[in-house]
């Protein structure tokens, strides 16, 4: 889902960067006042490294499409949406500067859809369904978050005239729906494992 350099006009890319940095600054200010800041910093560093590595690889599928996971929904379940957005920013920055994944000028757009929008939607949907069943909440929120990020990217690319809306919907939506379903199932397994091995990791206040 990384948007490369050259697809978005500079003015639009700059606008996305400014919006993303303003939102991230608010998130950082809010989370920096939490009493468990030291634990948050450690987990933020560890999870950022995991996201950088995990999202840099693709997995071949029988459909002939390379599967690329997001990991950020899992970070939301552990750290909450604000810290997850910051993790996304750090991971995308490292990938853009050091690994050539995603464009430097498109950093703001990538953070906006794969970090901020994804994290907030995952958390909101999780809270909505968590009273019904935790596993259902994990699955549905992962799927809805990734689909929301996909629609955000389609919107960004459409107004940049990178391609037509019809082509973007037809090419991106089915693929990321498949990824979302797979990642939702995987997140259930991982969260169940964490809960049984060391539930204290999940004790961090999410917002």
Roles of regions detected by a PLM:
Residues 111-153:
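Short helix-perturbing small/polar motifs within transmembrane alpha-helices
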Residues 2-74:
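Hydrophobic transmembrane alpha-helices
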Residues 1-7, 159-170:
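Membrane-interface helix termini and inter-helical loops of multi-pass transporters
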Residues 136-147, 165-207:
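C-terminal transmembrane helix-loop-helix hairpin of multi-pass membrane proteins
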Residues 56-65, 90-121:
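Interfacial aromatic-anchored transmembrane helix boundaries in multi-pass membrane proteins
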Residues 33-38, 76-87, 131-136:
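Membrane-helix interface "capping/anchor" motifs
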Residues 18-24, 115-125, 181-193:
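Hydrophobic cores of alpha-helical transmembrane segments in multi-pass inner/ER membrane proteins
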Residues 17, 41-46, 85-89, 112, ...:
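Hydrophobic alpha-helical transmembrane segments
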